[in-house]
Amino acid sequence: MKFIILALCVAAASALSGDQIGLVQSTYGKVKGDSVGILYAVFKADPTIQAAFPQFVGKDLDAIKGGAEFSTHAGRIVGFLGGVIDDLPNIGKHVDALVATHKPRGVTHAQFNNFRAAFIAYLKGHVDYTAAVEAAWGATFDAFFGAVFAKM
């Protein structure tokens, strides 16, 4: 059954149109330089995500936002997301990498969905978030997280 779900998710990623991929890549290009702002928005929206990182547990988000450790970590997360976006529609290796690092730590589907919601909220405040952009990002996250969830 998991194979069928995974096959459907890969097919969904492949079904992203060139226009959708272009919209996702262009809007991401406008925000990828603000990795600290993106991670801050994610941690602010769901403190359980911040608590999943030992170096940030129990620390005041506003106090750590300007630190080098936070900036480095934000760069890693946003860089990973950038790799997914750059390689669209080929998400397989990124799915495997994310599952390999997050499944052992017990990251939940809810936390992934909360990351998605926080990232989308951040995007809405920083790009021209049209209906077409919304559909493109929705299809991208549906395909990527669908494949991730099938393996977790």
Curated annotation (Swiss-Prot):
Heme b binds at residues 73, 102. GO terms for molecular function: heme binding; metal ion binding; oxygen binding; oxygen carrier activity. This is Globin CTT-E/E'. Belongs to the globin family. The gene is CTT-E. Keywords: Heme, Iron, Metal-binding, Oxygen transport, Signal, Transport. CDD domains: Mb-like. Residues 1-15 form the signal peptide. One of its GO terms (cellular component) is extracellular region. Residues 16-152 form the Globin domain.
